[in-house]
């Protein structure tokens, strides 16, 4: 037996083993600080620094991360315990162990944490808190915390966990100390946290918690799945300085490793949870609290109520324990029941520590079922007591000698920095060695030396000092050990004389339960030396102990399990993850899981079933109190009985106060019936602990509900308030099975359905709620259910979840049906009608039948199907039934089942007299006067336009009154009047409320709410006179509930800024009266002012009357003179009158002669036309001319349409689409739409087609789609890579057609959608990509036109004189020259071809026949291109065709004359363009540019030298540009002309170059225009432009620039002096275009393209060219007839005489005149300086026109003309505040000036109204009378004449002119018409 000295260790409660989930095994240790261990840690560091300077030894710094090696700890945790950082490493040495202690904690707990759940735990347990409280220390410092997670299932299961360390003292995200997401694939992980926090012990226990959540446990059906280990090292202190010695740079250090691998199975990864989101719920850890304040209240019955407050954390006290002598055991003397899991990890630990750890191993062996020993690595390891504990061999002494101590010190100095593997080898060597544990002491010198050593450097001087210090300290230690040796020897000798006591198992157990003083180590400071040196008895345990302990543990578990209550008190829990049961008492909804089922089918024969009503007629007996009731179930043992009793009891008990919870439960116990009370009392006696828990919270908030819930669980086994849903699931199953089979049970079915739905708790659920509401109708009998559902949808179309509303509506609907049935039954016999004559009854003529009988006129003895014989009723003749063919009865008496149903339908709809009958008509009827024919009536509906007159205003007021009272209080200055009311729908926030109708002004109003008191005004929604709010702007009135529901107005906010209702009280009416008085005074003042004005006017008229009297008197005086003068005047007037009549007669005669000549000319012209047509047929021949190689639109024979994709809050994006009724869904090419327009689809969709199977994972975002001129809801459109034909980018399939819920009609190229009655025009060719829409030109056509005119350079002399330096610098710069490749290296944008199918080989057809001239020209062009290094020889597999054309014009540099037939080399890239994705970058609007630059004063224009060649080709795209020229193949190094994406790429480049200079630089492809107001500004702007060109490598053409000119030609227009006109070369191109070219489709298309430049200068140009454009259609007539040539000549004549247009100034007023007919529309934009200026000052600035296909009605044409005109002229009026629109359509004027409600065609008016509203400016409409619109009317008739092609057109034109002459009464109109007639005659003669 050996005797040892024990260290000073204070141990607390022993370890506790978890017997069930959620009960942790925990260990704590509170001990003194080991100063010697700190010294060894410091010495080891100094030794390492000393070794680092020695030669041959590598320098290495040992950090805290190295000491906490995560790889080793994670692998060690599979066999031993993972270790944390020793306290002696984290903290510095302190004097006085009373104020400082080291605290270590370790606990393990198994738990089940699955998806949707969150587990919160305090970091330490309640028992640990009690131990810390008994130490008397105030503060704790948290040094390091660790959490280890071990999974309790297979590895690689694809699971993940979240660990959150948090401080719940914070209420926001600052509560999170650290968090880590852990992948559990390898099985276990460790998380270390160093928070460096100091707090009180109470705060530490209450607020430092961990939160655990998991993912990937879907389908987990086991119990516990995780084992959580927690460890802590901290310092307890009563001072503010805890000596934390580690520099924490980061709050959390997460050290992870791969862990241990196992046998491979099917691996699941956790990648699907990466970047996921964790939702942390509030902590649910319950910490015992105790009050600190009390308040006493005396009750009315003499009792006293006590109320406690200001609760704080409380340490619960355990019941006292007694020993064998019946003496109470002090807690401070109890044996420790749990130990520390965080042990020093110091590989340099000396043998002196082994004595302490040997003692620890023995001490723990006496405590619990397991033993812990400290191995050579410093790890606590748990081993089995009887098998793994080494046998103790007693020795005489365990204290080493002085020589041994010196040897140890020398060994330490020599091997101070050994590797960790040496320690591992010593671990395997056998039993640990035994050394004396020295008494820890500290001195100031040691602390000072320690401080010096920590701050010393690595120099040689400091190292020498360290060595001296180490030697001195070791000498001190050697002297101390010599003094202790003698005391140890004396203790050993005394221990040898005492016998060894062998103890049995019971004695061991008793020793464990009642530890003696000899077995409990205490602090050295408080014990004498002889007690510290007491004996330690070590014995070997008996082998049977383990078996007996297991049996004893099993018995204890059985006893504990039998003592648990199956209906114990439970707090509310979340039965479902998405159901929150916190707050007031709730009701958990049902789940979708299956509940119990009967499982047995009982045969039903003749059982007497009864209907169970939703409300039982049971009554509970009185409790003989005021209002209480007794709970007696009786025969009605159902939850309804308990719910009723609970409601009564809850209200009854709310008026009483109780001293404690026990009294409250006892009082409620007396409310139970006899049997029920016995049941409850037996439960209370059996489960006392649960009853005590219930009593603790019974008198708190929610205590009454807790008692009721417990009683319900006792009697019914569940409670929905606690989140349990057994009853709800049963009700949900019954609800799904409930069906109403017949009409008689509808009322009871409704009650059952409502009751069961309420019991499920899912009535208002977002998932199940809509289905429950809709199934109410579907489970009713089919006929009545569908009708009720349709009626409810009409009444409330938006409410998706509101079952009570549907039940109430169904009851009212069926009640009305019963009333109607009763009424119809009472009117079954109408015999009384003969005694009551009525007005307005004119017989049966108004009740038209579908068929009528007319006397047959073509009956020849052969009876047809429509022939009948009508005879008198009761005619005594043999007759044949009309509907069955049998003889002997009439049709109305026929009972034959085999009837002709067609004849039955005819007979029912046949209009006959009362005494007539119908019989069959046979062949060869003798009395043919009775034979009649049945005629059917065609239904038609004539569209009318209804305009509300003044008489309809009262009806509008009546209709509007149901949405709100139109009292003077509600109608304010901003409220629309009766004729202006426009209604809309105001939707509530909640889905169960109905939307209400409100004015558009109220919906769009920015409300300013003010509170009003009760009884003042009625609410707009509920019509109640309640307290609410009123808006100052729109005067809308709502109660507080409706205001919150419809306008999100909070009552608290309104009341906080308004005075209270009690303060207003009686002032409400006074306010109204005061406002009435103010308004009355205002009216009186207005009347007085008007009266004064009238009085002044009367005085002025009286003065004028007096003046007239005076003049009359003077006139009478000169009467004689006047008579003489009068005769002379009369003669002269008669002569002048005769002269005027003669002139008028001559004018009419000339007009008649002109008309006659016109008729003759028309007849002659028609004869010439016939001859020309014959000649064209006889002399027709084939000619072939090549003008250009422009790619035409691809003909595919499909329904092509251009659509706009417009997601919400985004601009529309236009693409080409086809309407395909054979496609199932809508698809779009992924390369045709920007990425931000589509999103990831919820599911992956597979599509099957003839090309194979395709997959889509993206879809277009929600929004709208623009088809034609109508927006539709965006259908579900999937985005994928499709192999579509060239030009097609989208397929509109049946999913869009089905979503319309209407019809679809296809007629030729017109598609009509019947939901919104929208017609769109399609084409059989694809839309040309990147076409210039304003000019209707392709890019190549535009470039050809622009290149055909040589623009000579121009330099203004005055500008050159002022800017001589700038021009000199321009000449010296090389970026103005002939070489476009000069600065090619500065090119920042390259041309890359996005090829659709890279496998396609481009094989252009070579030219077979080449003339020598073309071959020579091509060789010359190729050599020039090779010299410029823009092309190179190619070896590409692709091949396009190049050829020479001679078109366009050029200027001879010698003669200066224009030379036609300029040779150009053209490349046919048609096949390449078809295989290239389109670039959707749009070109800027020409009209927008012109309107922006037109008002400037000085211009400069530049063209790029071969602009496209200044863009380099991507190297990978170069082979695709290969072309065949002659017999050789070449490829482009620059972007060539002819690529369809070239203009878009070049425009993007130019926009990027000149970005930010839009205010003075306009760019359109390669044209650059600089515009300024002054010459000084222009110089600065030119310098900026030239610098940008130099930076980006742009080369300007020296021969095509104009600088400093006041007029400029740009984009086909001549600008200058605020005027705009068509360029002369455009006019010459249009007028000089040869007829031979016009006769070909290519020539006509080119001519129409050039004519597009003039569309803004010619009125109604769209109507004129419509017949010509029809010839360009694939199915149009390509031949030119005389009418066509007339139109061409007329257009050329108009182009020659184009007027100059004048751009409006900035402050001008804009007027737009519009006109529309069935085939087209036209608009004119005018301006004047002020709105009130006369019309004579108006100037024209633009024209616009277009055609309609298909034709439109008159009203639609006028509306569309106004809409198109406003759209075309936006650039002129968007910056204005007001606008005038003139139209000759009176219906539009009345519509806009009155209202657009109740129109027969709502779509047209709503579209028109929406367009005007969206302008954002004030629009005023004016009507143009016919007498002021003579020219427009004549032009319209002329256009109609040109378009018409029938034989009656000349005569109708003549009559039109005559009608125009009749309406024009003034000279101006007659002159205009005469001029028009002369022009027409001139055209016809040509």
Curated annotation (Swiss-Prot):
Q: Which residues bind Mg(2+) 2?
A: 1715, 1833
Binding residues annotated for Mg(2+) 1, in chain numbering: 1715, 1758, 1784
Q: Which domain of life is it from?
A: Viruses
Q: Where are the zinc fingers (CCHC-type)?
A: 879-896
Q: Where is the composition biased (Polar residues)?
A: 9-20
- Which InterPro entries does this chain map to? Aspartic_peptidase_AS, DNA/RNA_pol_sf, Peptidase_A2_cat, Retropepsins, Rev_trsase/Diguanyl_cyclase, RNaseH_domain, RNaseH_sf, RT_dom
Q: Which residues form the Reverse transcriptase domain?
A: 1425-1615
- According to the entry, every stretch annotated as the Peptidase A2 domain falls at 1215-1292
Pfam families attached to this UniProt entry: Caulimovir_coat_dom (PF22909), RT_RNaseH (PF17917), RVP (PF00077), RVT_1 (PF00078)
Tell me how the protein is altered or processed after translation. Answer: Polyprotein P3 is presumably proteolytically cleaved into several chains by viral protease.
A GO molecular-function annotation: RNA-DNA hybrid ribonuclease activity
Q: Which reaction does it catalyse?
A: Endonucleolytic cleavage to 5'-phosphomonoester; DNA(n) + a 2'-deoxyribonucleoside 5'-triphosphate = DNA(n+1) + diphosphate
Q: What is its EC number?
A: 3.4.23.-, 2.7.7.49, 3.1.26.4
SMART domains in UniProt: ZnF_C2HC
- Ranges for domain RNase H type-1: 1706-1841
Q: Where is the signal peptide?
A: none
Cite a GO CC annotation.
host cell
State the Gene Ontology BP annotations.
proteolysis; symbiont entry into host cell; transport of virus in host, cell to cell; viral penetration into host nucleus
Region (Disordered) location: 1-24, 420-466, 478-529
Q: What keywords is this UniProt entry annotated with?
A: Aspartyl protease, Endonuclease, Hydrolase, Magnesium, Metal-binding, Nuclease, Nucleotidyltransferase, Protease, RNA-directed DNA polymerase, Transferase, Transport, Viral movement protein, Viral penetration into host nucleus, Virus entry into host cell, Zinc, Zinc-finger
Specify residue ranges for compositional bias: Low complexity: 488-498
Please list the residues that make up the active site: 1220
Function in brief: Capsid protein self assembles to form a bacilliform capsid about 90-900 nm in length. The capsid encapsulates the genomic dsDNA. Following virus entry into host cell, provides nuclear import of the viral genome. Virus particles do not enter the nucleus, but are targeted to the nuclear membrane through the interaction with host importins.
Name of this chain's protein: Polyprotein P3
